[in-house]
Swiss-Prot record:
Belongs to the peptidase M1 family. One of its GO terms (cellular component) is extracellular region. Monomer. GO terms for molecular function: aminopeptidase activity; metallopeptidase activity; zinc ion binding. It is an enzyme of class 3 (hydrolase). Zn(2+) binds at residues 325, 329, 348. Exopeptidase which selectively removes arginine and/or lysine residues from the N-terminus of several peptide substrates including Arg(0)-Leu-enkephalin, Arg(0)-Met-enkephalin and Arg(-1)-Lys(0)-somatostatin-14. Can hydrolyze leukotriene A4 (LTA-4) into leukotriene B4 (LTB-4). It comes from Mus musculus. The modification N6-acetyllysine is found at residue 446. This is Aminopeptidase B. It comes from the Eukaryota. It catalyses: Release of N-terminal Arg and Lys from oligopeptides when P1' is not Pro. Also acts on arylamides of Arg and Lys. Keywords: Acetylation, Aminopeptidase, Hydrolase, Metal-binding, Metalloprotease, Protease, Secreted, Zinc. Its main location: secreted.
Length: 650
């Protein structure tokens, strides 16, 4: 086992953490009984046909876990999170200090136990119980083929169409279908990996060390402790290009020039601004991997190597806020982590706030308020569809046993979370002071997982005068209400600095609502100078006012080819929604084309909702499009689209 050691992060926090008692109903593992110190993966990738037969595609090898028993009374069994797609064939135990090759390796019995539809428990029995504080290594020999954690793409699902591709996606609870682990954000460990690939392929991982070992082997090491969901691997036909002093872009060769052009020189500016605000960037490198088009997310903040959708290659740097969001996770989420998935707002609400602080410094308050207004519109849309009183519209979500945390995903932790952090800044009343507080918060809880109580107690201790005033229980704005009551945020940050960009968009949208639009007034507005988010805001207003009077959408598309023929994904999404809301069948093909070009969940699901909520022709379009694209979508997205096409409760 390549030992990475846990570094100096075992120093207890200055306070006992509430999160030390946190339960995680989404994990079958005994993560409170054992401390995981290090994980090492030694895997070989094979690209064969799908299926269980010989020569089929899969990852095979070993996962070695370095563990320490935490129970005063010792333990005779260890439970890990696993999945039916993992075939474990052997387990051996080596007691004593890590790397002690003199210690005998003994085979140990193991079996699986049912847990939920998204995983199972792997139970390993010790022939002799381990005592309190005993250390040992457990080596598991296994293979994973088809399953939800490892995504295999055929050549036609990639941008280059020449070679297959494989990647892993751990968040929220999918890495148990990649390797046996404590699949909970409550605990963290360092990891290393040795990955063998076929000729002509390159492996990359979320690690701060990347070494080529011989023609087909790659060694990785992550020297800081991270939760299991942030361990990520991708293998494909990959090239790289430097875009800054500590950043490079990775992509298929056909995309590398576009990626280099779009992000050269800008990432360092984002990182440096983040460091000024939130403290040192501890992860060493910040690289970007542009994924194949079927990647279901805008970005996944795997440390050192963010996985991003190729939709971000807009050609005009207009979608850089997604990168700022992922960079912000370097402090909020990756360094300080939610202890379970019911506290997801601690990752995402803070990251939205951090993203918008960086954006304000780099692009100004007007632009940032405009972007935040589009976020607020998404929250409004979500709450209109789900109903404000839906329990998922609380910041603290109660995830019931058996419920996949991924199924609770929505805009609330992002945008309502952002509103709560903004409210706390508003209580402080001084932006510099609140920035200093955020830096102190990161420093206090770095490399740890926390609950809302840990954060809020720290906030009130940091600002004793606010504690004295009882700001946690101001009627209507109680911290408990913020966390545990569903519905619209009690406080909304002031977005009026964005009025200079929003007002013209609102006024222009009004002109399109009349049955005889004043084309002279419309053409006097120079939207050619508008930034992408101003156009997005305008289209959101048009969508809210749809259906428009007959003929207006056709005229709108003809007047603004910049919108109706856009290549920018945010514009294509909204234009598609407007087409469907107005049943503008001449342009239906554009909806299908967009859904065939990418598989991002945030773009895909709203369009299927709009098609199924539209005319008979729109519903037919939904079924035809899904039949044509299902094979190139991520398995989670396929499941969600199927639920939209044929709701279970209908």
């Amino acid at each position: 086992m390549e030992s990475g050691g846990p570094g100096n992060y075992s120093a207890a926090a200055r306070r006992p953490l509430h999160s030390a008692q946190a339960v995680d109903v989404a994990s079958a593992s005994s993560f409170r009984a054992f401390e995981i110190l290090h994980l090492h993966l030694d895997l070989r990738a094979e690209f064969g046909p799908p299926g269980p037969g010989p020569g089929s595609r899969g990852l095979s090898g070993t996962a070695t876990l370095e563990l320490r028993c935490l129970l005063p009374e010792g333990a005779s069994e260890l439970r890990l999170d696993s999945h039916s797609c993992l075939e474990v064939t052997a387990a051996t135990l080596r007691r004593g200090q890590p790397g002690d090759q003199q210690a005998p390796a003994e085979p140990v019995p193991f079996h699986t136990q049912p847990f939920s539809h998204y995983g199972q428990a792997l139970c390993v029995a010790f022939r002799q119980p381990c005592g309190a504080a005993d250390r040992f290594e457990l080596e598991l020999t296994y293979r994973v083929g088809e399953g939800p954690g490892v995504c295999w793409l055929a050549p036609e699902q990639t941008a280059g169409k020449k070679k297959p591709f494989v990647y892993t996606q751990g968040q929220a609870v999918l890495n148990r279908a990649f390797f046996p682990c404590f699949d909970t954000p409550a605990v963290k460990c360092t990891y290393s990996a040795l990955i063998e690939v076929p000729d002509g392929f390159t492996a990359v991982m979320s690690a701060d060390t990347w070494e080529k070992r011989g023609p087909n082997k790659f060694f990785f090491q992550m020297s800081h402790p991270i939760p299991s969901y942030l361990i990520a691997l991708a293998i494909g036909d990959l090239a790289s290009a430097e875009v800054g002093p500590r950043s490079r872009v990775w992509a298929e060769p056909c995309l590398i020039e576009a990626a280099k052009e779009e992000y050269s020189g800008v990432i360092e500016e984002f990182l440096a601004t983040g460091e000024k605000l939130f403290g040192p960037y501890v992860w060493g490198r910040y690289d970007l991997l542009f994924m194949p088009p079927s990647f279901p997310f805008g970005g996944m903040e795997n440390p050192c190597l963010t996985f991003v959708t190729p939709c971000l290659l807009a050609g005009d740097r207009s979608l850089a806020d997604v990168i700022i969001h992922e960079i912000s996770h370097s402090w909020f989420g990756n360094l300080v982590t939610n202890a379970n998935w019911g506290e997801f707002w601690l990752n995402e609400g803070f990251t939205m706030y951090a993203q918008r602080r960086i954006s304000t410094i780099l692009f100004g308050a007007a632009y940032t308020c405009l972007e935040a207004a589009t976020g607020r519109a998404l929250l409004r849309q979500h709450m209109n569809v789900s109903g404000e009183e839906n329990p998922l519209n609380k910041l603290r979500v109660k995830i019931e046993p058996g419920v996949d945390p991924d199924d609770t995903y929505n805009e609330t932790p992002y945008e309502k979370g952002y509103c709560f952090v903004s409210y706390l800044a508003h209580l402080v009343g001084d932006q510099d002071q609140f920035d200093k507080f955020l830096k102190a918060y990161v420093d206090e809880f770095k490399f740890q997982s926390i609950l809302a109580e840990d954060f809020l107690e720290f906030y009130l201790e940091y600002f004793p005068e606010l504690k004295k005033k009882g700001v946690d229980s101001i009627p209507g704005f109680e911290f408990d209400r913020w966390l545990n009551t569903p519905g619209w945020p009690p406080y909304l940050p002031d977005l009026s600095p964005g009025d200079s960009l929003m007002k013209p968009a609102e006024e222009l949208a009004e002109l399109w609502v009349t049955s005889e639009p004043d084309m002279q007034a419309i053409e006097a507005v120079a939207i050619s100078t508008w930034k992408t988010y101003q156009l997005v805001y305008f289209l959101d207003k048009i969508l809210q006012k749809s259906p428009l009077p007959p003929g207006n959408v056709k005229k709108l598309g003809e007047t603004y080819p910049k919108i109706s023929n856009a290549q920018n994904a945010e514009l294509r999404l909204r234009w598609g929604q407007i087409i469907l809301k107005n049943d503008y069948q001449e342009e239906f093909q554009k909806v299908k084309d967009f859904l065939q070009s990418q598989g991002k969940q945030k773009y895909t699901l709203p369009l299927y909702h709009a098609m199924m909520g539209g005319s008979e022709m729109a519903r037919t379009l939904a079924k035809d499009t899904f039949a044509a694209t299902a094979s190139q979508l991520h398995s989670n997205v396929v499941n969600y689209v199927q639920q939209i096409l044929a709701p279970k409760d209908s």
